Regions:
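ATP-binding N-lobe of GHMP and related small-molecule kinases
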Residues: 1-93, 111, 115-120, 156, ...
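Conserved, helical-rich catalytic subdomain that frames metal- and/or nucleotide-binding sites
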Residues: 49, 138, 143-236, 251-264, ...
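DPxDG-like acidic metal-binding loop motif
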Residues: 93-124, 135
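Glycine-rich beta-strand-to-loop/alpha-helix junction loops that act as flexible
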Residues: 97-98, 239-244
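Short, well-structured alpha-helical segments that form the helix of a local strand-helix-strand
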Residues: 118-129, 257-261
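Short hydrophobic/aromatic beta-strand micro-patches
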Residues: 247-249
């Protein structure tokens, strides 16, 4: 079973608290994009894992492995699997590639074994793997809050095109959180942003990312990427998630393509994408 594992951008991210268990709480507009990994899972006599990227290991931190082991335990699945991951979304990028791989695995096994998982069970399983996994299961525009378990789908009025620009180095989410100061970081108005997106109005004045300053202290090249985007004519430049990817977005597809051309000879990972507005399961 071949599944697409769609990435996302955070069109503003507000880290607004820390729970007693140490988890940070957030409010954010998550937008899925048509940039994805491919997860192929088949029943097999023995467990095997392969990937087109040499650095991807089938270890305890691998979200596909987490999902496989979780599903086997939850539903008494005895089979082994042949797993192949075509990895295109960069790691430590703030694009939820690993989370999407985990949710794609849950989808695949849900289909292979006709489990007919309820929404509550899907939420339970996804949250056991990671905070962005539930959103990537549905990959539909949403206001996400709590620690990722609260999802309110939104109707984005216009079509948008995105340019992703990632420096060479990634950001450790754990390290980034440890450097944050919730009293001094930016706290964008996520609910106002939701409102203007649903009305098709200008959203740029409502953008912000609470984690950006901390991430730049770890990877200063993020600031360079933002400057290069703006110098190339981007309407704005914002970091996604905990970084290190920076992006811009516009309803003007030609503008995004022209910015891509201006930056394609620089030492960045570049990707043009479109925001997904409708639910896609596979």
């Amino acid at each position: 079973m071949l599944c697409r594992a769609y990435g996302k951008i955070n069109l503003s991210l507000d880290i607004n608290g820390v729970r007693e268990d140490g988890y940070h709480t957030l409010e954010s507009i998550f937008l899925p994009i048509d940039f994805y990994d491919l997860v192929d899972i088949e029943k097999a006599d023995e467990m095997s894992f392969s990937s087109n990227k040499y650095y991807i290991r089938y270890n305890e931190s691998n979200t596909i492995r987490k999902a496989i082991e979780l599903m086997k335990n939850e539903f008494n699945i005895k089979d082994n699997f042949k797993i192949d991951l075509k990895k295109y979304i960069p790691t430590q990028a703030g694009l939820a590639g690993g989370s999407a791989d985990g949710s794609a695995t849950i989808k695949a096994l849900n289909h292979l074994y006709d489990l007919n998982l309820s929404k509550d069970k899907i939420q339970e399983l996804c949250m056991k793997i990671g905070s962005d996994v539930l959103f990537t299961y549905y990959h539909k525009p949403a206001l996400v809050s709590g620690i990722g378990e609260k999802i309110e789908f939104i109707d984005v009025k216009k079509d948008y095109y995105v340019l992703l620009i990632k420096p060479k180095y990634g950001v450790s989410t754990k390290e980034c959180y440890s450097l944050m100061n919730l009293d001094t970081c930016v706290h964008p108005d996520i609910h106002k942003l939701k409102e203007v997106l649903e009305n098709g109005e200008d959203f740029i004045s409502y953008l912000g990312n609470s984690m950006e300053d901390a991430a730049i202290s770890l990877v200063p090249e993020i600031a360079d990427a933002k400057k290069d985007l703006l110098d190339s004519g981007a309407p704005f430049a914002l970091m996604s998630g905990s970084g290190s990817t920076v992006f811009t977005m516009s309803e003007d597809e030609e503008l995004i393509k022209n910015i891509y051309k201006k930056l394609e000879n620089k030492n960045y990972f570049l990707r043009y994408a479109k925001v997904l507005k409708n639910k896609r399961n596979w």
